[in-house]
Swiss-Prot record:
Protein name stated in the entry: Lipid-A-disaccharide synthase
Top EC group: transferase
The encoding gene: lpxB
HAMAP family recorded: LpxB
EC number(s) recorded for this UniProt protein: 2.4.1.182
Keyword Lipid metabolism annotated: yes
Disulfide bond is among the record's keywords: no
Organism field: Bordetella petrii (strain ATCC BAA-461 / DSM 12804 / CCUG 43448)
Catalytic activity: a lipid X + a UDP-2-N,3-O-bis[(3R)-3-hydroxyacyl]-alpha-D-glucosamine = a lipid A disaccharide + UDP + H(+)
Gene Ontology molecular function, alphabetical: lipid-A-disaccharide synthase activity; phospholipid binding
Amino acid sequence: MSLSIGMVAGEPSGDLLASRVIAGLRRDETVQCQGIGGPAMQAAGFDAWHPMHALTVFGYVDALKRLPSLLRTYGDVKRRWLASPPSVFVGVDAPDFNLKLELALRQAGTPTVHFVGPSIWAWRYERIHKIREAVSHMLVLFPFEEELYRKEGIPVTYVGHPLADAIPMQPDRAAARQRLGLDADARVLAILPGSRSSEIRILAPRFLQAAQQLQRRDPGLVCVVPMVNAQRRAEFEAILAQYPVPGLRCLTAEDAASGGLPVAWSALEASNAVLVASGTATLEAALFKRPMVISYYLSPWMRRIMAWKSGQQRPYLPWVGLPNVLLRDFAVPELLQDDATPDKLAEATWAALTDDAQAARVEARFAAMHRDLTRDTATLAARAILEVAHGAA
């Protein structure tokens, strides 16, 4: 009997992650995967009823503008799967969309798997109640999440992090510099101010002013800034014109110098240290074993929302950056909110660039973390999904 697997991914990271799992699932040619997905999933044999960008939104304003379209897409896939239930449904990240869909399908008798645990350990812990109702089985990327969900009575499997499988245990700085055309002996700083317009608008001026100070200390310092696309590059370069940094290299995926790799990976691999916005990029920097300074700054209105939300819930972890969360320690500096000043960013980043002993300690801790996260994620996830599907058969 063939298996039908419903799946929804709403972000490029989810598309890539799901594509690897689909490849594992479709080793059995009778397995059919369909739903909402991107080009990587389709290349792996996924039948996309709707393209992934139907769910991709950038911020609250964009979400409000696109709400009618999102509701139509949700209604369409829900109707299809209620009329012809899949053997199992897999929601890949995108919790605001997928948890609602998972609840409807599970209540109708379809087993559900949620792949990539919502960051309830960071904020909105109250979502655990909805997760318990909506999800038959959680697949999580971080080891500490397994214990968290198990304590809440939710079946869970730790599958490791796909970035740990994809990023080499021993980065090749010389090869990365050759790809990017950088001097082998230069001191290189990778600057990653985020992938959203709002992040770039707020963080880029602070990061660039810090870079200006660093270049006054070391005029030979080379700054490399990867951007997710041409639009973000244009936004960044408009800010760069106000805070010029001589010799700064701004790269996008279109640049042949990236060598076919994610452009951020080339920048990180080539660097001596990293100044980075809190987010997945901090984990990438850690997997490349680079010392870093993590920063973030919320707008005043977002701060008010977060302050109110935090008053309603349990206290959260003291760390923001993923490397520190995973290591349960301030292994690298975090400069957040009012501490995210150009002066403080420059001072901390200078230490990351020049303190060789600290860099060696950080590299050793990140290497151990990398080993802990390496689990052949795609194979483990595919196996767990099939077990849930067969267990419900």
